[in-house]
UniProtKB/Swiss-Prot annotation:
Family: Belongs to the cyclic 2,3-diphosphoglycerate synthetase family.
Sequence intervals crossing the membrane: none
Molecular function per GO: ATP binding; cyclic 2,3-diphosphoglycerate synthetase activity; ligase activity
Keyword Nucleotide-binding annotated: yes
Superkingdom of the organism of origin: Bacteria
Protein's recorded name: Cyclic 2,3-diphosphoglycerate synthetase
Location of the protein in the cell: Cytoplasm
Length: 442
């Protein structure tokens, strides 16, 4: 096992040499290099560690340079405080995992997620830094864009409420509306799962899959995505888009990745911890909700700065979401039901009225809270239709209520609005068609 040792000058060199010998014996490690992370207290001039030594201005840079020079399978950390702390170690872990190497310490081991290659056609993945960052909305937007441009996409959707066996929905042929979703609900399906949302709103072929659990680096504990990927490979489509779930990453190799993060998130959560790993393996960052009040003043600039510290070359596109009904609402009195925070509901309602000619007489942002949603619906005035996202309780509460009351239920998507987004996504799709050459970025 080709191994990079991480060492520092706070340890007496003979102690480090003895530790390296023991690691080689116990782990079957073959030392190919050492990265010197800093510290001078116990190191003399010209100390010899018996391996090529890589040093830099800071610990993270030393590890990055060593990983670039030497192809290793494991990074063994023999350093400690005060040379490296928790933040530095998470950055080092991200670098190691992105290079395909295990990161091993005295009481921990992180391994890179296992990504399986499914041959057959070009592929993209849309992954996220957490739940409710708009990842599935970006996936749907990407699918529609690719469809318009003649790429003939299929989406493999991974969700916590997906089916026990991968299920194919031909969004273009099926009328995936309220009646269809209610029937799916009666069969015991999670009818607001992401794959129903994508099929209904984007009208592309969608393969629904499930996953449970998510590791620090995004690997699901259990999933049937690999089976879904094989099904997608056999479909009459031209490109496959894999939709992640929360911060979990589809366990398949892809040609290009889009990372979706929310500007409302803590910058440390996006660019620190193993958010840095997600930045390192991605080719484009879409920074959603990049407006006040979701993002406080200066937050977008701070996030971009933090991202640049990890990936200076990664394109970053700030974006906002705006609702788009998939049915005609002009002249209607509607109740708008969403997962959006209360602070932006008035703005979104105004967008619907101005852009689509409806009158929004009631709003609720409690789509993910069934009890509060029920209270909101009870207190609403009479409407012509419920306008709802396909999320959370959209089917079992809102759609069912509409059916019981004899009111129309019209589904609503959220489009990312951002300068340069279409061009960046299409460049990634074309690059995926050429195959991954080893160079990242667009």
């Amino acid at each position: 096992m080709r191994t990079l040792f991480l060492i520092d000058g706070e340890h007496y060199p003979p102690v480090v040499l003895d530790a390296m010998r023991r690691v080689r014996e116990q782990l079957g490690a073959k030392g190919v290099a050492a990265a010197f992370l800093g510290g001078t207290e116990k190191i003399g001039e010209g100390a010899d560690y018996g391996l090529p030594l890589v040093a830099a201005e800071d610990p993270v840079s030393a590890v990055r340079q060593a990983l670039e020079r030497y192809g290793v399978e494991a990074v063994v950390d023999l350093s400690d405080e005060p040379v490296v702390g928790y933040r530095e170690r998470m950055r080092i872990a991200s670098l190691a995992l992105a290079a395909g190497a295990r990161y091993v310490g005295s009481d921990f081991e992180l391994r890179p997620p296992e990504m399986r290659r499914v041959p057959g056609k070009p592929s993209l993945a849309v992954i996220g830094t957490g739940k409710r960052v708009g990842k599935t909305a970006v996936t749907g937007y990407l699918a529609r864009l690719l469809d318009r441009e003649g790429f003939r996409p299929a989406v493999v959707s991974m969700g916590r409420g997906g089916p026990p066996e991968p299920e194919v929905l031909e969004g273009r042929r099926l009328e995936v509306g309220s009646d269809y979703l209610l029937r799916a609900l009666e069969r015991g399906a999670h009818a607001a799962s992401d794959y129903y949302e994508t099929a209904a709103l984007s009208r592309v072929t969608t393969v629904g899959c499930r996953r449970c659990g998510g590791g620090l680096a995004g690997e699901p504990f259990v999933s049937n995505v690999l089976e879904g990927a094989r099904i997608a490979a056999g479909l009459d489509t031209g490109i496959t888009v894999f939709d992640g779930s929360g911060a979990a990453i589809p366990p398949v190799e892809v040609d290009r990745r889009v990372l979706v993060a929310g500007a409302h998130q803590d910058p440390e959560y996006v660019a620190g911890y193993l958010g840095a790993y997600r930045l390192l393996i991605s080719d484009l960052l879409v920074l959603t909700m990049a407006e006040e009040p979701m993002a406080p003043p200066g937050r977008v600039e701070e996030l971009v700065r933090r991202v640049r510290e990890v990936r200076p070359d990664l394109p970053v596109i700030p974006a906002v979401f705006r609702p788009r009904p998939v049915g005609e609402v002009r002249g209607m009195r509607v109740a708008y039901v969403s997962t959006a925070p209360p602070a932006v509901l008035k703005r979104l309602a105004g967008h619907l009225e101005e852009g689509y000619g409806c009158e929004v007489v009631a709003v609720s942002g409690n789509l993910s809270n069934r009890s509060k949603l029920a209270e909101d619906l009870e207190g609403m005035p009479g409407v012509d239709a419920y306008l709802t996202e396909i999320k959370a309780a959209a089917v079992d509460v809102v759609t069912r209520r509409g059916a019981e009351e004899g009111r129309r239920v019209i589904y609503c998507d959220n489009d990312p609005v951002a300068e340069g987004l279409d061009g960046a996504l299409l460049r990634l799709a074309r690059a995926a068609g050429r195959g991954r050459s080893g160079d990242r970025g667009v």
